[in-house]
Swiss-Prot record:
GO terms for cellular component: cytosol. It holds the Pfam family THF_DHG_CYH. PROSITE patterns: THF_DHG_CYH_1 (PS00766). SUPFAM superfamilies: Aminoacid dehydrogenase-like, N-terminal domain (SSF53223), NAD(P)-binding Rossmann-fold domains (SSF51735). This is Bifunctional protein FolD. The lineage of its organism: Bacteria, Pseudomonadati, Pseudomonadota, Alphaproteobacteria, Hyphomicrobiales. Keywords: Amino-acid biosynthesis, Histidine biosynthesis, Hydrolase, Methionine biosynthesis, Multifunctional enzyme, NADP, One-carbon metabolism, Oxidoreductase, Purine biosynthesis.
Length: 295
């Protein structure tokens, strides 16, 4: 049997529709237009693509979108001054600095400087700590999207064996916290883990977030398991053709074993942007002292 495909296109469109409805409510009932500021330093072509799609989707959801572009050789102080300006701007409810930053810039200092109330990436240590403590927090978009996708297959993740492969601050660690909030039993694997294939075969839920193309093989998957592929690995096309996007999972093999699986492209990546809109609405509500929205 081949796996059910968890379709990021459909699910992210549903999330965006809910965000748009919430934005309409905020405008009519409270006169608030949620605003997202995206800061892009340098001109990495992949980042350009993401930033463009963020801008488009923010506007389509009825929110205000502010783009700030700085040259790759911008001094750290100038970037910090922009963050301070955005922190103080009442029209801005969410601030995202596209990562990674060009060499020579200190991204930790930048992330630290973002007002935690506007940190829609959920990377500020205040938000990471609040999430780990079970307090209200803005949570990183990719883990949030990954959980939403898993929950389209399993209404409850309670008691399930979840394996998170990867321990980054952006994905692995916050994903672990969100899974614990869902009452899953969580194992974290990383580059030093012994016998990853055997560990993987015990997992009902596999989240692959390592950044290595097609590392997770089909025979690592427990039959019927749900596989969420967080990897986006850009690989040059054959014979000078277009670049290909590959996930961290060997999709063709894994889909013959898994019960449900996300594709790349068309999976978690689309959810990341949709969840950024969710976080911007959540931030706007919290900043204005309104209850947590239904998105
Ligand atoms: N501060 C920060 N926050 C981020 O959330 C962040 C970041 N920096 N830097 C880069 C990564 C990457 N990322 C993606 C967003 C959308 C897709 C996406 O839409 N992917 C589509 C198509 C992608 C394509 O065709 O190139 C898909 O998977 O189907 C992927 C990846 C957000 N990131």
């Amino acid at each position: 049997m081949t796996a059910r495909i968890i379709d990021g296109k459909t699910i992210s469109a549903e999330v965006r529709a809910r965000v748009a409805a919430e934005v309409t409510r905020l405008k009519t009932d409270h006169g608030i237009t949620p605003g997202l500021a995206v800061v892009l330093v340098g001109n990495d072509p992949a980042s350009e693509v993401y930033v463009r799609s963020k801008h488009k989707q923010t506007q389509e959801a009825g929110m205000a979108s502010f783009e700030h572009r700085l040259p790759a050789d911008v001094p750290q102080a100038e970037l910090m001054a922009l963050i301070a300006k955005l922190n103080a701007d009442p029209a801005v409810h969410g601030i995202l600095v596209q990562l990674p930053l060009p060499k020579g810039l200190d991204s930790n200092a930048v992330i630290d400087a973002i007002d935690p109330a506007k940190d829609v990436d959920g990377l500020n240590p205040t938000n990471a700590g609040r999430l780990a403590s079970g307090l209200f927090a803005l949570t990183p978009c990719t883990p949030l999207g990954s959980i939403i996708m898993a929950k389209t297959v399993h209404a409850s993740l309670e008691g399930m064996n979840a394996l998170v492969i990867g321990r980054s601050n952006l994905v692995g660690k916050p994903l672990v916290q969100l899974l614990l909030n869902e009452n899953a039993t969580v194992t974290i694997a990383h580059s030093r883990t012994r016998d990853l294939p055997a560990l993987c075969r015990q997992a009902d839920l596999v989240f692959a977030a390592v950044g290595k193309a097609e590392m997770v093989k089909g025979d690592w998957i427990k039959p019927g398991a749900t596989v969420i592929d967080v990897g986006i690995n850009r690989t040059p096309g054959k014979d000078g053709g277009k670049d290909k996007l590959l996930g961290d999972v060997a999709f063709a093999e894994a889909k013959e074993v898994a019960g449900a699986i996300t594709p790349v492209p068309g999976g978690v990546g689309l959810m990341t942007v949709a969840c950024l809109l969710v976080n911007t609405v959540r931030a706007a509500c919290a900043i204005h002292g309104l209850p947590k929205p239904a998105v």
